[in-house]
Every structure is written in C-alpha cells, then in structure tokens.
UniProtKB/Swiss-Prot annotation:
Claim: Amino-acid biosynthesis is one of the keywords in the record: no
This protein's record includes keyword tRNA processing: no
Remarks, miscellaneous: The inclusion bodies are the site of viral DNA synthesis, virion assembly and accumulation in the infected cell.
Entry similarity comment: Belongs to the caulimoviridae viroplasmin family.
Function: Enhances the ribosomal termination-reinitiation event leading to the translation of major open reading frames on the polycistronic viral RNAs.
Major location category of this protein: host cell
Cell location: Host cytoplasm
One CC-aspect GO term: host cell cytoplasm
InterPro entries membership: Ribosomal_bL9/RNase_H1_N, RNase_H1_N, RNase_H1_N_sf
Protein name, as recorded: Transactivator/viroplasmin protein
Native organism: Cauliflower mosaic virus (strain Strasbourg) (CaMV)
Entry keyword set: Host cytoplasm, Translation regulation
Secretion signal, residue range per the UniProt entry: none
Entry's Gene Ontology BP terms: regulation of translation
Amino acid sequence: MENIEKLLMQEKILMLELDLVRAKISLARANGSSQQGDLSLHRETPEKEEAVHSALATFTPSQVKAIPEQTAPGKESTNPLMANILPKDMNSVQTEIRPVKPSDFLRPHQGIPIPPKPEPSSSVAPLRDESGIQHPHTNYYVVYNGPHAGIYDDWGCTKAATNGVPGVAHKKFATITEARAAADAYTTSQQTDRLNFIPKGEAQLKPKSFAKALTSPPKQKAHWLMLGTKKPSSDPAPKEISFAPEITMDDFLYLYDLVRKFDGEGDDTMFTTDNEKISLFNFRKNANPQMVREAYAAGLIKTIYPSNNLQEIKYLPKKVKDAVKRFRTNCIKNTEKDIFLKIRSTIPVWTIQGLLHKPRQVIEIGVSKKVVPTESKAMESKIQIEDLTELAVKTGEQFIQSLLRLNDKKKIFVNMVEHDTLVYSKNIKDTVSEDQRAIETFQQRVISGNLLGFHCPAICHFIVKIVEKEGGSYKCHHCDKGKAIVEDASADSGPKDGPPPTRSIVEKEDVPTTSSKQVD
C-alpha cells in the first residue's frame, strides 16, 4: 500500500512539472521572445522545488497519515485507543486540476502557494553550524625552576616569574593534564618537590620588583640617597610641584659632601667638575630627575645634557623648562639635536630661622656636540657650617663675573628672565634692544651688596674692583655710611660678618649707583 501511495505522489509531481513546462512554452509562443523562453527555462530548477512543495500540500488526508502521539516508549505504531483522524482535522484540498494561465507568472511564486514553514520547537537542536564560534581557551604554563616555580594559568604571572631572571625554564601547554605531566616528569628527574598549581588570583609576585630584585646588586647604604620629598609614583603636573620644599642646610651639606667624594664609579649618568673649594655636578642623559632638582636647588650644577624628551629636567621650575622647550622648537632647525644647559649659580644662605636666600642662576642653552666627560676625582671634604658664608661669597663673585660677561656678547637672545633667573642662548643676529634692556635690568637688580640676601662688604668690594677695571664707578650707601668699607682684598672681612641671625633685621636689596660704563 505504501508503494502505491509513493507512486501516486510521484505521478502528481510529474504532472505538475509537465503542466509547468507547457505553460512556459505557451507563454514563449505568445510573446514571441526567445529570451524570455531561455529565462524561464533557466529558472526551472527552483520552480521544481516549489512544485514539489505544492504537490505535498495537495495530498488528501487519506494519502498522508501522521503518526499519532505515543503513550508508551517503544517502536512507533498506531495507537488503537486514539482515532487516526477526525473530520475537523481534514483540510480542504483542490481535487481537480486547474489549468495554468499566463497571468499566473506575474504573481508571486507564479501563483503556486507555498506552505508555511513550521516553527522549530525548543527541544529541536539548532540547524545552524556552530563550528565557527570560538570558545575561550586557557593555556597553562609550567615554570620548571626558579624562586617562583609552579604551574600558572595566566601569562602575566608567568612573565613576572621568568622575565629578566637568568636560567629559568618555562613552557606552554594546551591542557592542565599535559602541564601536570610535564611538571611531574621534571620534578621526578630532578628529585625535587612537586610543583603546585598557582591560579591567577593567588600569584603573589610583581613583574617589576621580582626580576629587578634578583638581577640587581644589593644597594649600597645611602650612596645615592634622595633628599627632600619622596619621588612621586607618576610624573606630576607642574602645578603639583610648584611648591617644592625648601632645601635645608643639612640637605646642602649632604649634597656638597656627595659631589666632593664622587669618583665616577657606579654611575655613568653624571661626572663632576672639581675645584679647590667646591665640586659641581654635570648630568648626562638618563640622570635621575629628582637628583637634578635637588642639585639645582642647592646651586651645585655646572652643566645638564638632557635627553630629547627632557625627562632629566622635568622637576625644574616650570618657566625654565618651558624656555628650554621653546628653544628646541623655535631656535634650532633640527629638533632632534642634543642640547646643553650651562648654569652659573650662587648657593643658598640660611639663618637661624631657616632659608634666607635661594640661589640665583644665569643659564645658557645651546646645541651640544659630543660630550667628553672629565675625570671625576674624589676630593677632600672638610666643610663646616661656619665655612658656608665664605663659600657663598666665592660663588657670588663667580656669578657676577658670568653675568657681566654678557656685555661682551653682541648676539644674544633672551629666552626667559625672572627675578632671580636669566635664561639666554646665542643668536645669529645682533641682540635686539628689548633683550638688551632685559639684561641691563637684571644686572642692576642683582649686582649689589645684597646679592646673597644680606649686605655683604666682600661682595661690594669685589664689585668696586670689577667696575673700576672697566673705568666706571660703584657706590653703596651702606658702605658710604661707614657700616663696612673694604680697602683691599687682604682686608676683606666680608665672610666673617656673615648673614644676620634673624630675618627681621635683613635690609632690602639696594639698587647700586654705577656709571654707564658698567653695563655697556
């Protein structure tokens, strides 16, 4: 019986296909166009599939019988307790064959009804291919030896345990089984303890400090001890470091002793320039920015050779740093060239109550050639607190000489001028009147007996000698009143006078009276 039903179904399908072909032929003859005939023949394949669906939809319930729901597990068979089909379930089906008209080809699907697709139930597996979906895969890493040997499931922890540590072996595995087998084989052959599995959240190590602690030599006691505040964890904005703590006398004595005893061993980012009374720092690329800032505040720097990103001077005063940046971008063609900062500075002066005078600087910026460091020698350091005033006078005299030498230079560009700092660079053109006035104003304000924050007869005597050598004159109303008159260098008692013990009796700075030849 089932074979007869299949044959009848095939017969109906073939009859529908035959009617479809005849309709196409009649349409082609009616239009007289061979192109439409070819087009319709070309679309024969999908129409066959639609005809099959149509044929399946025209079967009567007597021809197609659905298997009723089973009440017990086992082989599918008809349930004798349930009716095979009810009259209300019978669908009205067209039994007679309707001829196909040419107008049917203009209707959707050529007039052939398409049965609706059944909705898939939730119990049916999805039909789409899920082979392209990528599922997360965890790799496992075996660190065979070292202080943090074990099995890890995170590459970051593995890298922390191996990066920078010599002689540590590690390997990646796809599964924990392979990793455990390899780890056990290694520990068995080496006769060591079994390696533990260390999940990501339980790894107690830090990538930077771990490798650095193993490879770096032990720290020497306070060889490069930083003074002042601790180095910030991240580079602060300029507004956050504008109120830097004042340097104390103990800080200065420490830095003075450090630069005097430095012999060039253990640090290639700096070298020293040594004189009889004082030694100065020369900082090269990759120098410690905090060290540079503290030496700058102490007035103990001669030259800085910064990197292209100027990281070495990032803690210097903002106006000085901005002047250096403008020099790189506006004053030289090749911004990748190395530059230098040549500094002539005084040193701080203290009283009983604290800092009285901050250093004053004259800074020259220029393009640096190849740096040839001088040999650093360990010098004798026997400075005492009572010697600081004499040292301040000595650096003050050198500062005045450097400032007056600007009068001999005819091509200068002033990059920045402030109350206590002048930054300049060489220029290809003559010094303009605006820059010349800025230099003269700075000289008149700074060159006086109050250069160090208090009236110093030794400074006045030095200024008199310099000005008289140039044919000019210098007058100080303190000296004219008889407070302190120095007749010659041998009778110089300035350093012995020293700064006042308190700030309350410090007199204001004097504007010296000089002839025009002094600042020409």
